[in-house]
Regions:
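Short, flexible, glycine/charge-rich loop motifs used to bind or transfer phosphoryl groups or to couple energy/partner
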Residues: 101, 123, 250-253
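Gram-positive cell-envelope targeting signals
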Residues: 1-46
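Surface-exposed substrate-engagement region within the catalytic domains
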Residues: 191-201, 205-312
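Short low-complexity stretches enriched in small and charged residues
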Residues: 62-68, 81-94, 122-127, 156-158, ...
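Polar/charged alpha-helical tracts
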Residues: 32-35, 39, 123, 302-307
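Solvent-exposed, charged interface segments at domain starts and junctions
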Residues: 29, 33-62, 89-92, 178-214, ...
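Substrate-binding cleft of extracellular glycoside hydrolase catalytic domains
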Residues: 103, 107-225, 233-235
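Functionally critical loop-and-helix segments that line ligand-binding/catalytic clefts
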Residues: 47-110, 255-313
């Protein structure tokens, strides 16, 4: 009987080594490509971060981002008109007013605060959907020529900024002439000491019977507001005028103040003034976690105003 031929073990070994070698080469190639892919992902992430580098102090997750210093200025030819369609007002998930159009939010939510609001928990305020805060720098006394710094100015500035809330400022004026208004503006500038702001420094004049500035004429009040705002503007900040709907309409020549712009106070379900204002203070009875008692609530409409998407036609 013929014996079976024994297999050639040497040939099997050579083939096995060849196959293992090919597998190793493929595996090494795959691993060498992985760092390159990771590097590309990191590069893409960096590009995305770079694209967002222009965004300043943060807005809430549903609000319009802040990419530059906010200006309230309007064209003097448009100042006596309403550029908004108030049907676009909606309550957002924080129960704050928002201006919505075509599925986009064209507004920001804000507060204005002073020592009268006490100590503020700014982290809690941020978590209430607040994007910006107007902080009082000081005030002139109603019955005397005395200027007083707000006792919690520095605390409010630091707290808001630490929690990524955009900041502006305001001064409560009782100036009776342009020189006093310039002095008030210089006081504000000295207290801020070059502090970087996202929002304007606002001239707040609220005349009441018996106040030292109550009897001023429209021309005098306009000149006083211009003196304050131009001094602020000359120092590199934006400026604006705050007043109630009736006072803005009756106490100022608005076309002369249009280059600064307006912050309107009117406590109603929608503004009634035919004025191209930028910010609307819609209540002085707001409630927020982080602030004891009532607080003024505001909606910044500059994204709608400047984009031309607030058109009510």
């Amino acid at each position: 009987v013929q014996r079976p031929v024994r297999p050639n073990n040497t040939l099997f070994i050579v083939v096995a080594i060849f196959i293992v070698g090919i597998a190793l080469i493929i595996n090494i190639g795959a691993h060498s490509a992985q760092p390159e892919a990771q590097e590309q992902v990191q590069s893409d992430d960096q590009d995305e971060m770079t694209d967002m580098s222009g965004v300043k102090q943060g807005a809430g997750d549903n609000s319009f981002p802040i990419t530059d210093d906010v200006s309230f200025a309007v064209d003097s030819r448009d100042v006596y008109s309403n550029p908004y369609d108030w049907r676009n007002l909606e309550w957002n998930k924080y129960n704050n007013l928002a201006y919505e159009k075509d599925g986009k939010t064209l507004s920001r939510e804000g507060i204005d605060v002073s020592q009268h609001n006490g100590e503020i928990d700014w982290n809690a305020v941020k978590n209430e959907g607040i994007d910006f805060a107007m902080v009082r720098v000081g005030a002139r006394a109603k019955d005397a020529d005395v200027i007083i710094e707000d006792s919690v100015l520095e605390q409010n500035l630091e707290g808001a900024k630490r929690n990524n809330i955009a900041v502006g400022a305001y001064f409560y004026s009782q100036a009776t002439n342009a020189d006093e208004a310039r002095n008030e503006a210089e006081f504000v500038l000295s207290k801020l000491s070059g502090e970087e702001l996202d929002y304007p420094i606002v001239f707040d004049f609220e005349p009441e019977k018996g106040d030292r500035a109550y009897t001023l004429s429209t021309e005098q009040r306009t000149d006083i507001a211009k003196a304050f705002c131009s001094t602020i503007k000359g120092a590199g900040y934006n400026s604006a005028i705050y007043s109630s709907s009736s006072d803005l309409t009756c106490l100022y020549n608005l076309d002369e103040l249009a280059p600064y712009g307006f912050w309107l106070a009117e406590y109603n379900y929608k503004p009634t003034a035919d004025i191209a204002f930028a910010v609307w203070q819609y209540t002085n009875q707001g409630t927020l976690k982080g602030i004891d008692g009532a607080v003024d609530l505001n909606i910044d409409l500059t994204p709608a105003l400047q984009a031309g998407k607030g058109d009510n036609s």
